[in-house]
Amino acid sequence: EVLTIDGKNAEVFNLLGVLKLQQNDVISAINWIEKAVEIKPDVYFYETLFQAYVRAGLFKQIVAREKEVLEKFPDNFSLLFNIALANKKTKNIKAAIKFYDKALKINPGSYLAWFNLSHLYSIEGETENAVSALKICKKIRPNDIDTDYFLSLALMRTKNYDKGLKLFETRLCRETATALQNKTYPNKATKETLWKGENIKNKTIYVYYEAGFGDVIMFSRYLPLLANRCGKLLFLPQKQLVPLFRDNPLGIDVVIDKYIPECDMNFDVHAPLLSLPYLLGLKGDKVFAYPEGYIRPNKELAEEFKKKYFNNDKIKVGIKWQGNTYYDQDRVIPTKFFKPLMAVENTQYYSFQTFEGSE
């Protein structure tokens, strides 16, 4: 009714957009708010419009309005934050860093701005800056698990393995793995029996997988070191990796390939696999146990695969283009980018992609 009287009432157009946002009709909301901005370029209208663009994933529209917004409102934190976010989402990393810096000069207490900035520093290989940003995050939210986890990774990238491995104990997959074992063996796999690095020379330790196949293969390098410290080593890998550890025992006494009832499961202490470098107290370069290699292929399988797939004189290249996007959206490489590589003469490419992304 107001618009029939005043067809250019920016406040009403913006209010209609806000109401549409509340109804999750984001595209209609954007149409209304864009009209409000055209009539009256008010800072509040721009803030609402950028929020709607973010909800719709229309980050290019934010970047397109970057210049006009900065000319009018160069010191608005909300607008600068969303411009930085839009550049981050559109892979314009250096611009994103610049705008997060500008936003933080206005509001230095923004956890999200520091957290996002730390991620961008990591992408750019500026690991010391990433650590500094995450330390500020930790001051803002001292008990935040995500901060501790990403700070652990950043510290290890700067080769500060002592502090990094300690904070790595906050990782979510550790909690998931120990909780699952506690549910499976409620009377034995308890918090009290978690191995804390103490002497277990004459004791049995039960180590179990966590995270993905690659993590288990990489961290299995610590099993021989653990075997030298304990009386007996039980290891539960993912079912698909059981044959690999049968061929490469790595000091394991029992590779568990099926469910064992609690009454038949005997161990003194237990630990998730990815905790081993920390629990073993490895320092400095000792973290990289067995750099010369510790996993060997099954000779019969290797010969079979050679005849079936690799019976050629070309340079053989295995590729994988996608990780688990539930945890990290940045571990995806569009397959089109491999095309120039495949044009190189005398090469043969093999897909190692499984599960998500294999389609």
Region locations from a protein language model:
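Alpha-helical solenoid repeat scaffolds of the TPR/TPR-like class and their adjacent stem/linker regions
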Residues: 1-359
